[in-house]
């Protein structure tokens, strides 16, 4: 199975600043011109919400302050400017069978 190493485990960012979360895959996630990397946001008591799919595509209804980049084995989620409502845990996810997830990054807003 593909292992996703996500960092940092926790992050405290001041309101209006940038949050950057990294995810490294144990093998390339590039297939047929796409990168099979997705990013989710989860708040306590709620199901995960898809933010970014195929490395850099913004899911419908998600604010443009969320952006994704990367290819191959190295991927990044950026949030800028951070808002109070962005406090949550963020997960990277690869959608090659079998699916696997990163261990999560807890974002705190200062």
From Swiss-Prot:
Residues 39-53 are annotated as: Framework-2. Residues 1-23 are annotated as: Framework-1. Disulfide bonds join 23-92. Residues 24-38 are annotated as: Complementarity-determining-1. The keyword Transferase does not apply. Residues 61-92 are annotated as: Framework-3. Transmembrane segments: none annotated. Residues 101-110 are annotated as: Framework-4. GO terms for biological process: adaptive immune response; immune response. SUPFAM superfamilies: Immunoglobulin. GO terms for cellular component: immunoglobulin complex. InterPro entries: Ig-like_dom, Ig-like_dom_sf, Ig-like_fold, Ig_sub, Ig_V-set, IgV_Light_Chain. Keywords: Adaptive immunity, Disulfide bond, Immunity, Immunoglobulin. Residues 93-100 are annotated as: Complementarity-determining-3. The keyword Disulfide bond applies. Residues 54-60 are annotated as: Complementarity-determining-2. This is Ig kappa chain V-III region PC 7210. It comes from Mus musculus.
